[in-house]
Curated annotation (Swiss-Prot):
Ranges for domain Glutamine amidotransferase type-1: 3-225
Keyword check for Cytoplasm: yes
Subcellular localization, as worded in the UniProt entry: Cytoplasm
Protein purpose: Part of the phosphoribosylformylglycinamidine synthase complex involved in the purines biosynthetic pathway. Catalyzes the ATP-dependent conversion of formylglycinamide ribonucleotide (FGAR) and glutamine to yield formylglycinamidine ribonucleotide (FGAM) and glutamate. The FGAM synthase complex is composed of three subunits. PurQ produces an ammonia molecule by converting glutamine to glutamate. PurL transfers the ammonia molecule to FGAR to form FGAM in an ATP-dependent manner.
Protein name: Phosphoribosylformylglycinamidine synthase subunit PurQ
Organism of this sequence: Exiguobacterium sibiricum (strain DSM 17290 / CCUG 55495 / CIP 109462 / JCM 13490 / 255-15)
Active site: residue positions: 86, 194, 196
Molecular function terms from GO: ATP binding; glutaminase activity; phosphoribosylformylglycinamidine synthase activity
Cytoplasm is among the record's keywords: yes
Pathway membership: Purine metabolism; IMP biosynthesis via de novo pathway; 5-amino-1-(5-phospho-D-ribosyl)imidazole from N(2)-formyl-N(1)-(5-phospho-D-ribosyl)glycinamide: step 1/2
Name of the encoding gene: purQ
Length: 227
């Protein structure tokens, strides 16, 4: 597979995402600047963490209007793989590709530490290499990771099995302990924790690696069956 890492002004986890794909997975990856208007030739899109446009107005609120985002929407509508991590998750929500909103953490402080997650659905293209209900350890680094949605949306997420990851010990107040969700089609995932920072033992663990290996296996299968 060939991946595009979207770079917005203020992105700071693009290097980590690039490293996870190129060095940990050995897959092809390129940076794509936010002013571009084509994703032709790519099989997957990765929206990294950071502080796009300085997080002015709201996290991701300005980035959603970047030229590349219209192409990301088209890409997602075609059933292709889109992953947004931390600020990338916030951008996906602001762009309407995922439901809900991300508020300030309940403690009103930026948090940077490792947390435990539970794999709620291992039947997505992002989680198939994990065991059902597997507990994994992944870093977080955010000040606005408190996921919220209304009752109807939360019921929909549960019914459609769109909740991919939950926190075992909720650090930010997210509704239902939600750490990551997919769209209804299952080809778009947004999550606040950083799997790209957990792909090597040297840097603290490899629990994030299975997300990327799942993505490659399932994504490659999807590409083959839809060409």
């Amino acid at each position: 597979m060939k991946f595009a890492v979207i770079v917005f002004p203020g992105s700071n986890c693009d290097l980590d995402m690039y490293h996870a794909v190129k060095d940990a997975l050995g897959e092809e990856v390129e940076y794509v600047f936010h002013t571009e208007t084509s994703l032709e030739g790519y099989d997957g899109v990765l929206l990294p963490g950071g502080f796009s446009y300085g997080d002015y107005l709201r996290c991701g609120a300005i980035a959603q209007f970047s030229p590349i985002m219209e192409e990301v929407k088209r890409f997602a509508a075609e059933g292709k793989t889109v992953l947004g991590v931390c600020n990338g998750f916030q951008i996906l929500v602001e762009a309407g590709l995922l439901p809900g909103v991300l508020h300030r953490n309940t403690g009103l402080k930026f948090m940077c530490r490792t947390v435990e997650l539970k794999v709620e659905n291992n039947e997505t293209r992002f989680t198939s290499d994990y065991a059902a209900q597997e507990t994994i350890t992944i870093p977080i680094a955010h000040g606005e990771g408190n996921y919220y949605c209304d009752d109807a949306t939360y019921a929909m997420l549960q019914t459609n099995r769109q909740i991919a990851f939950t926190y075992t010990d909720n650090p930010n107040g997210s509704r239902g302990d939600i750490a990551g969700i997919t769209n209804k089609a299952g080809n778009v995932l947004g999550m606040m924790p950083h799997p790209e920072r957990a792909v090597e033992l040297l840097t603290g663990g490899t629990d994030g690696l299975k997300l990327f290996t799942s993505l490659v296996k399932q994504g490659a299968h999807h590409v083959k069956t839809t060409v």
